[in-house]
């Protein structure tokens, strides 16, 4: 008899109560998040006098970032505040975890303070899953990046950005370029693109920075930028994750740029209306040329803006679903 495993992200009714990974979520769930995010975009309009809605009024959201972050932590904080939540940013370096307290003991103590939601970034893959297993039924966990494993809200905001500019995934070719081996963003993007029916997903990079098994995920692999960029609709550039590398996987940053840096000449191989994306932080002159990053086809800053609406949508949806 085949043993089936329940998805820990879902309620018994199949609704999203935690967001831990895009893997295992249906197209309907992803589309619902993207559609909800579209409704929240107007909350951040510059001409809107009060940039708030009362969806999470009275709820406490704890941001627990055990790794450094600028865009993700800040946009989660803005998103929670625009939903009218009370936001607590834990200073990890000054917390009891720096004195040897375990992750679960930290979570249990914060839960005793009536936390309603934890937004967690951690260097260890699977840490948000561990937390989700041990919180009370009414508490929700959102993964803001765990090791190499997943970065689901980045994947979702990337999908929102692509859909905003390209509408329909079914005719698109999307290339993900760079250090895919160490990238949680790449994994989340690949799962999201294939789930949403993207016509073709490409991975471009040196052999040393591409994980095995990409073909089994429905990805076409290229080791040449010139070949991989031909006719693509969107290019997602990734930085070199030097902090996760062990050993000499590359000769030098300069040599990497010569082979895999996105220049205007290489971008010209894509479709004329192709968009350029990057999850940040960017390393100009390593994976992307400044002329491209700041060019007319770049939507990198728009990704950051859309990230607020997407994270508002995720928080609002999970907060409404309990077992």
Curated annotation (Swiss-Prot):
PROSITE patterns: CARBAMOYLTRANSFERASE
Top EC category: transferase
Catalytic activity: carbamoyl phosphate + L-aspartate = N-carbamoyl-L-aspartate + phosphate + H(+)
UniProt superkingdom: Bacteria
Family: Belongs to the aspartate/ornithine carbamoyltransferase superfamily. ATCase family.
Pathway as given in its UniProt record: Pyrimidine metabolism; UMP biosynthesis via de novo pathway; (S)-dihydroorotate from bicarbonate: step 2/3
Record's keyword terms, sorted: Pyrimidine biosynthesis, Transferase
Gene: pyrB
GO molecular function: amino acid binding; aspartate carbamoyltransferase activity
Binding of carbamoyl phosphate, residues: 71-72, 121, 151, 154, 280-281
Stated role: Catalyzes the condensation of carbamoyl phosphate and aspartate to form carbamoyl aspartate and inorganic phosphate, the committed step in the de novo pyrimidine nucleotide biosynthesis pathway.
Name of the protein: Aspartate carbamoyltransferase catalytic subunit
Oligomer and partners: Heterododecamer (2C3:3R2) of six catalytic PyrB chains organized as two trimers (C3), and six regulatory PyrI chains organized as three dimers (R2).
PANTHER family according to UniProt: ASPARTATE CARBAMOYLTRANSFERASE (PTHR45753:SF6), ORNITHINE CARBAMOYLTRANSFERASE, MITOCHONDRIAL (PTHR45753)
Enzyme Commission no: 2.1.3.2
Residues annotated to bind L-aspartate: 99, 184, 239
GO BP terms in the entry: 'de novo' pyrimidine nucleobase biosynthetic process; 'de novo' UMP biosynthetic process; amino acid metabolic process
Gene Ontology terms: cellular component: cytosol
């Amino acid at each position: 008899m085949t043993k089936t495993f329940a998805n820990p992200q879902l309620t018994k009714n199949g609704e999203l109560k935690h967001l831990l990974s895009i893997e295992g979520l249906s197209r309907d769930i992803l589309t619902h998040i993207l559609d909800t995010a579209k409704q929240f975009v107007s909350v951040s309009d510059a001409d809107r006098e009060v940039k708030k809605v009362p969806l999470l009024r009275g709820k406490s959201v704890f941001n627990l970032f055990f790794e450094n972050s600028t865009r993700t932590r800040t946009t989660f904080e803005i998103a929670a505040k625009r939903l009218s939540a009370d936001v607590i940013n834990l200073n990890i370096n000054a917390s009891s975890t720096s004195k040897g307290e375990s992750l679960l003991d930290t979570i249990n103590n914060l839960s005793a303070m009536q936390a309603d939601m934890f937004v967690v970034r951690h260097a260890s893959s699977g840490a948000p899953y561990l937390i989700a297993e041990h919180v009370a039924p009414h508490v929700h966990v959102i993964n803001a990046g765990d090791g190499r494993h997943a970065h689901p809200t980045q994947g979702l905001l990337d999908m929102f950005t692509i859909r905003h500019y390209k509408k329909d995934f079914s005719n698109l070719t999307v290339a993900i370029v760079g250090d895919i081996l160490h990238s949680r963003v790449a994994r989340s993007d690949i799962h999201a693109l294939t789930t949403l029916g993207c016509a073709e997903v490409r991975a471009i990079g040196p052999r040393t920075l591409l994980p095995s098994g990409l073909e089994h995920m429905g990805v076409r692999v290229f080791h040449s930028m010139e070949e991989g960029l031909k006719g693509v609709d969107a290019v997602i550039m990734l930085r070199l994750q030097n902090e996760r590398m062990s050993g000499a996987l590359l000769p030098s940053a300069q040599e990497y740029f010569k082979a895999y840096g996105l220049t205007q000449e290489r971008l010209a191989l894509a479709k004329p209306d192709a968009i350029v994306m990057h999850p940040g932080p960017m390393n100009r002159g390593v994976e992307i040329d400044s002329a491209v990053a700041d060019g007319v086809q770049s939507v990198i800053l728009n990704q950051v803006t859309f990230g607020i609406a997407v994270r508002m949508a995720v928080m609002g949806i999970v907060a409404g679903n309990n077992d």
